[in-house]
């Protein structure tokens, strides 16, 4: 399981994130292929190794001649819908631009569909978004933690005139997200950067406990005095926190019930050892479910991320558990020529339980054209042979 931490203490922009991804080992070809799929005109990603504030960094130039710099949210949506992109890349890119459109509509008092993107509607910004989300999908990061975001100070020239930093759209995008001015007297977080960070983030804060494999350092376009204009991307695996199993839970009352099987499957895929639903009655008499997941502490970040991505919850509870598990062993029994696995459980060396694996029983029953109950009874009887005398099955 891959986890990532974004150090945005010097701000964030699309090209800084692209550079950090390349520096962290994502092939430029992966980013270029995603950009080519969506761009209606040629766009080239050119990588350059530079220094910012004395630090070595990767600068990713997005080179384009764009004949239509102003596009609506509908225009961008059409481009992405028609692009030959993987569904997860397309979905993330759409979420980034939807977030941008919603923020712009909020600050200008209009609707998202009426928003005319200016800087972020240009092909270079579309390339930034598509390339960055393709890069993170390539990394396979199931958890992305973002540091408090430095936004800068002063003023910035935009299509709407001279605006204070952070400009209104950035301030709206970062609503509820840890941010601060920082040392720079310039804009350090762009709308594209803010939208990308807030879409990709599964958590905010300092670097989580992790074993770091690669570090990418993405360079901004300017090299101001006083601070390195870079964004750092740490990629690795979660450190084993040594805290044993955790129970993660949340209450959900507004999710289509048809989605729950996919949610449970996603949590198990993310690393949960078990996941289940409990019907509950919430305040105001509203029927709901408690979603519970049991997970080792070292894999909890990915399961947290899956819960937030797969459900409508905006918070979850977490508590450490003490788990007592018997030693287990798998053996095989034969029922009319069909091999059925039986799980043995030992306590102090004695086999105290033996249970057939139901999937094997169901398969054998289908192959033998016999009732499942009959095959199960035979498998249980054969499993008894493994019990230590005097113990139960």
Swiss-Prot record:
Pfam families from the entry?
Ni_insertion (PF01969)
Report the GO molecular function annotations. lyase activity; nickel cation binding
* Annotated InterPro entries: Ni_insertion
Q: What is its EC number?
A: 4.99.1.12
Q: Signal peptide: which range, if any?
A: none
Reactions catalysed according to its record = Ni(II)-pyridinium-3,5-bisthiocarboxylate mononucleotide = pyridinium-3,5-bisthiocarboxylate mononucleotide + Ni(2+)
Q: Name one GO biological process term.
A: protein maturation
Q: Gene3D superfamilies, alphabetically?
A: mk0293 like domain, Transcriptional regulatory protein pf0864 domain like
Q: Which domain of life is it from?
A: Bacteria
Q: Which UniProt keywords apply?
A: Lyase, Nickel
Q: What does this protein's UniProt record list under function?
A: Involved in the biosynthesis of a nickel-pincer cofactor ((SCS)Ni(II) pincer complex). Binds Ni(2+), and functions in nickel delivery to pyridinium-3,5-bisthiocarboxylic acid mononucleotide (P2TMN), to form the mature cofactor. Is thus probably required for the activation of nickel-pincer cofactor-dependent enzymes.
The similarity comment for this entry is: Belongs to the LarC family.
Protein name (database record): Pyridinium-3,5-bisthiocarboxylic acid mononucleotide nickel insertion protein
Origin organism is: Nocardioides sp. (strain ATCC BAA-499 / JS614)
């Amino acid at each position: 399981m891959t986890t990532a931490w974004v150090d945005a203490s010097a701000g964030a922009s699309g090209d800084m994130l692209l550079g950090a991804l390349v520096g962290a080992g994502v092939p430029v070809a992966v980013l270029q292929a995603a950009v080519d799929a969506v761009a209606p005109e040629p766009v080239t990603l050119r990588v350059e190794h530079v220094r910012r504030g004395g630090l070595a960094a990767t600068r990713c130039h997005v080179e384009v001649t764009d004949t239509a710099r102003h596009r609506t949210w509908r225009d961008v949506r059409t481009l992405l819908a028609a692009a030959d992109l993987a569904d997860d890349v397309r979905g993330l890119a759409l979420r980034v631009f939807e977030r941008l459109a919603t923020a712009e509509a909020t600050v200008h008092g209009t609707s998202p569909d009426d928003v005319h993107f200016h800087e972020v509607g240009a092909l270079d910004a579309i390339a930034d978004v598509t390339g960055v989300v393709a890069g993170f999908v390539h990394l396979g990061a199931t958890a992305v933690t973002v540091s408090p975001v430095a936004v800068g100070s002063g003023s910035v020239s935009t299509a709407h005139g001279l605006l204070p930093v952070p400009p209104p759209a950035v301030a709206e995008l970062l609503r509820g997200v840890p941010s601060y001015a920082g040392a720079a007297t310039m804009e350090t977080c762009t709308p594209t950067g803010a939208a990308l960070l807030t879409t990709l983030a599964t958590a905010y804060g300092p670097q989580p406990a992790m074993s770091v494999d690669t570090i990418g350092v993405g360079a901004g376009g300017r090299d101001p005095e006083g601070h390195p204009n870079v964004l750092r991307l740490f990629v690795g695996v979660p450190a084993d926190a040594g805290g044993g199993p955790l129970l993660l839970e949340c209450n959900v009352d507004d999710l289509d019930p048809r989605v729950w099987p996919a949610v449970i499957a996603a949590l198990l895929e993310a690393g949960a050892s078990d996941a289940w639903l409990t019907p509950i009655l919430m305040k105001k008499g509203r029927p709901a479910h408690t979603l519970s997941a049991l997970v080792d502490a070292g894999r909890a970040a990915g399961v947290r991320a899956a819960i937030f991505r797969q459900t409508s919850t905006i918070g979850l509870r977490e508590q450490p558990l003490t788990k007592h598990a018997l030693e287990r062993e798998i053996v095989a029994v034969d029922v009319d020529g069909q091999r059925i696995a039986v799980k043995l459980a030992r306590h102090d060396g004695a086999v105290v339980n033996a249970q057939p694996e139901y999937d094997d029983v169901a398969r054998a029953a289908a192959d033998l054209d016999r009732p499942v109950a009959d095959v199960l009874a035979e498998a249980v009887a054969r499993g008894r042979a493994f019990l230590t005398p005097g113990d139960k099955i």
